Amino acid sequence: MNLSYTPATICAVATAPGRGGVGVIRVSGKDLLPFAQAISGGKTPKPRYATYTDFFDAHGQALDNGLLLFFPGPNSFTGEDVIELQGHGGPVVLKMLLARCVELGARLAEPGEFTKRAFLNDKLDLAQAESVADLIDASSETAARSALKSLKGAFSREVHGLVDELINLRMLVEATLDFPEEEIDFLKQADAIGRLRRLRAQLVGVQATAKQGAILREGMHVVLVGQPNVGKSSLMNALAGDDIAIVTDIAGTTRDTVREEIVIDGVPVHIIDTAGLRDTDDVVEKIGIERTWQAVERADLALLLVDSREGLTAEVQSILERLPPALPRVQVFNKVDLSGEAAGLAEQDGHPLVRLSARTHDGVDILKAKLLEMIGYSGADEGVFLARQRHLDAIARAADHLELAEADWEQVEIFAEELRMAQNALSEITGEFSADDLLGVIFSRFCIGK
């Protein structure tokens, strides 16, 4: 990268807050061998080997003991000299070691600054850098494996392959601009439009994989709504496989929203159980009902629960009418164990209808499968990498530019410009074409020490 940064020495605790057996201080900067010698009492650590040593303060008194590792740049995570101090994991000990690092000239690192330096020093591209945070934040094994694929460059290789094809096609198209009277014949002979169509097909494949990766990262927010005592809390417990919410036969037991994250086939699903919807004079219950509608506004999908013995009553119809028209929903007819109906999937008024029993779990797997289908998840295979919404936006813009390029290919200057814009959009993913403010936003969301 050609973006500049101040080459100050930075330091941070790289392990999680709290007490533990081991705590790690990470330091990055230029020419850190004297730094390592000062904190270890004059020892010269062998690069990429663990050196057992005491860690000393400015007066020669030991603060802690443990392992010192020295990674000379550029063969390090950040591309600079990197030191790791692996001591005991107590907060007080780590605070003393961090203060000693500051005494030796380091400053406290900003969130994500180590990874940002790795990006700026061409150790990682931007998609790989983001996957560091995604791997840390992964809420399922599938998401973690996909994030690791991105960190190892699976997503970046796909993008670089598309960009390379675009560059070659641009070179061909722009070379014809000097020969306007022959440019169309030249492009036809070179099969420019055929190459463009193949490129668009490749992009569609990458886009589909990226969408699956984005679902693994973002998951979906599902709100449970319905009248009191229709089994919303029981269904939440059935989906979670645990007793998350209190369940009684008393209508109105749930008076506030209860949130739980579960994992369905590797996809994080944020379930929100809500207060039952009914007319009430109870002040507390009214507040809970208002929060129910607030949760509905923020949800990706609604599960409208109905007592299968009663069906779509006038009260249920009023709830249906208030749901946002654009909000996807599934009508869940619960308590089939009491109504005598069979669990299964159907459709009503253009929306899915699932019959189940939250108490016996009969039909719950049908609902889980339907949720994944509605969010567009087809299952993670070995090739799925994790992606973010900004990646999907960039791919969509590139696809739009390639569509325009094909439509206007006989106007060669427009053809060339649309190819350039498509290349720029894709290059935003890996960071070859990114604004400083975008980088600031991305790395500010990392934890300190990464």
From Swiss-Prot:
Do you know which InterPro entries this protein is assigned to? Answer: G_TrmE (IPR031168), GTP-bd (IPR006073), GTP-bd_TrmE_N (IPR018948), GTPase_MnmE (IPR004520), MnmE_dom2 (IPR027368), MnmE_helical (IPR025867), P-loop_NTPase (IPR027417), Small_GTP-bd (IPR005225)
One GO-annotated biological process of the protein: tRNA methylation
Task: Write out the residues that bind (6S)-5-formyl-5,6,7,8-tetrahydrofolate.
Answer: 26, 84, 123, 450
Q: Where does Mg(2+) bind?
A: 233, 254
Q: Which residues bind GTP?
A: 229-234, 248-254, 273-276, 357-359
Question: What is the role of this chain?
Answer: Exhibits a very high intrinsic GTPase hydrolysis rate. Involved in the addition of a carboxymethylaminomethyl (cmnm) group at the wobble position (U34) of certain tRNAs, forming tRNA-cmnm(5)s(2)U34.
List cellular component terms (GO).
Answer: cytosol
Q: Where does this polypeptide localize?
A: Cytoplasm
The alphabetized UniProt keywords are:
Cytoplasm, GTP-binding, Hydrolase, Magnesium, Metal-binding, Nucleotide-binding, Potassium, tRNA processing
Keyword Hydrolase found: yes
Q: Enumerate the GO terms in the molecular function aspect.
A: GTP binding; GTPase activity; metal ion binding
Task: Name the Pfam families for this protein.
Answer: MMR_HSR1, MnmE_helical, TrmE_N
Q: Is Hydrolase among this UniProt entry's keywords?
A: yes
What Enzyme Commission number(s) appear in the record? 3.6.-.-
What name is this protein filed under?
Answer: tRNA modification GTPase MnmE
The UniProt entry, under HAMAP family, shows: GTPase_MnmE
Binding positions for K(+) per the UniProt entry:
229, 248, 250, 253
> What does this protein's record comment on cofactor binding?
Binds 1 potassium ion per subunit.
Reported cofactor(s): K(+)
Query: Subunit structure, per the record?
Result: Homodimer. Heterotetramer of two MnmE and two MnmG subunits.
Q: Which family does it belong to?
A: Belongs to the TRAFAC class TrmE-Era-EngA-EngB-Septin-like GTPase superfamily. TrmE GTPase family.
Gene3D superfamilies in alphabetical order = P-loop containing nucleotide triphosphate hydrolases (3.40.50.300), Probable tRNA modification gtpase trme, domain 1 (3.30.1360.120), tRNA modification GTPase MnmE domain 2 (1.20.120.430)
Highest rank taxon of the organism: Bacteria
Q: Where is the TrmE-type G domain?
A: 219-376
User: Which species is this record about?
Assistant: Chromobacterium violaceum (strain ATCC 12472 / DSM 30191 / JCM 1249 / CCUG 213 / NBRC 12614 / NCIMB 9131 / NCTC 9757 / MK)
